[in-house]
């Protein structure tokens, strides 16, 4: 019976009638290597830092770098803790190291045109940042919680919900 189920699932996946969730785990090395990489990137991405001060919450990001476990990263905390540097700089560089091209979007810009739509293969030049984030392999949003309601021909909705639904549907982190 187990073999029949496996065969059925394989056939349905091949016929594109079924999606099997299979999270992609990423790692940028052991804990020491990730710590060194984090510190190097953080310093390079913010030239205003005179002296780097390692904050306790950075250790959680470094743990995620060691093994993402196929999940994304949600950063919450007080102002001035480095969330935007991590979100808009560090994570895109890390993903770039894994050949994943991403663009971090500020939450205020969800309904604005995606600036690289014309140069992104297959994208309509009128694509919004919201549409980009629903299609991108690893959506990155800075300043979540300040995003405006989206008005689509009179229908108002929260764009973040569309991004989360797409990520869940397609098994994205």
Spans of features found by a protein language model:
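A short, basic N-terminal segment
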Residues: 1-69
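Short loop/turn elements that form and flank the Walker-type P-loop nucleotide-binding site
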Residues: 68-69, 133-136, 168-171
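Hydrophobic anchor at the beta1->P-loop junction of P-loop NTPases
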Residues: 73-75
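Walker A (P-loop) phosphate-binding loop of P-loop NTPases
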Residues: 80
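Conserved lysine of the Walker
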Residues: 83
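Hydrophobic positions on the alpha1 helix immediately C-terminal to the Walker A/P-loop
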Residues: 86, 90
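AAA+/P-loop NTPase substrate/partner-engagement loops
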Residues: 92-139
């Amino acid at each position: 019976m187990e073999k029949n189920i496996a065969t059925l699932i394989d056939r349905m996946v091949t016929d594109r009638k079924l999606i099997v969730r299979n999270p992609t785990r990423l790692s940028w090395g052991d804990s020491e290597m990730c710590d060194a990489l984090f510190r190097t990137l953080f310093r390079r991405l913010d030239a205003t830092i005179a002296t780097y001060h390692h904050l306790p919450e950075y250790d959680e990001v470094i743990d995620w770098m060691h093994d993402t476990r196929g999940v994304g990263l949600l950063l919450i905390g007080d102002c001035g803790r480095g969330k935007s540097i991590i979100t808009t700089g560090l994570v895109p560089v890390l993903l770039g190291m894994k050949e994943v091209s991403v663009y971090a979007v500020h939450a205020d810009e969800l309904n604005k045109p995606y600036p690289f739509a014309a140069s992104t293969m297959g994208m309509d030049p009128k694509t919004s940042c919201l549409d980009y984030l629903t299609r991108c392999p690893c959506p990155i949003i800075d300043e979540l919680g300040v995003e405006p309601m989206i008005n689509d021909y009179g229908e108002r909705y929260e764009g973040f919900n569309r991004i989360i639904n797409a990520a869940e549907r397609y098994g994205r982190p």
